[in-house]
């Protein structure tokens, strides 16, 4: 997260999970298998167990986590726990570390797969007074419904069912539906299979009703150029330095560069 900001990101997108003993942590995957030397679901491990894990164990520069590199390529391996930032961070640690950074939270799981934590997330954000400079998202419509009902003052993005409604209406030639309450953004991929999702009609329609368009996860410069030309409001990327160059190359006004 620190490196993303150093490279030019002005927001961070991250995923939230709940430990077995009820602590919210941030990690892309719902398991620790891919990044640590252990295996298991975050929901089944206590915070003490999670704190012991080396989250950089399989990391190699220029790659995501890989298991077949030469031993000397794992340049961060073994530096945790002496360097706590290489472990799995709690949500509260992230909020303390980045008080002035816009944060986008994805509630990755909910009931029945795990103990639901929608209201707990809202309570933590309220306790840090982070209700106006965050967006909460989820691929679970039920999680968003619960969160919005409990914390209507905290911004959210559209859920899957709402995105489908938008796509269907635009396909019919209808207008972008008005959004009520806490919804401030539609967060979508550029393409879904072979179908282009981010069209001029979608961008125009969303802007007409005050909804920002955020697109994930874009790492190729050519796609960044296309999206900037379409006028999207935010691009979520694993390569913020590439996006910064795209912004400079296109002479674009500043848009949100979210480091994932």
Label every model-predicted segment:
Residues 1-260:
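Phosphate-group recognition and catalysis centered on beta-loop-alpha active-site segments
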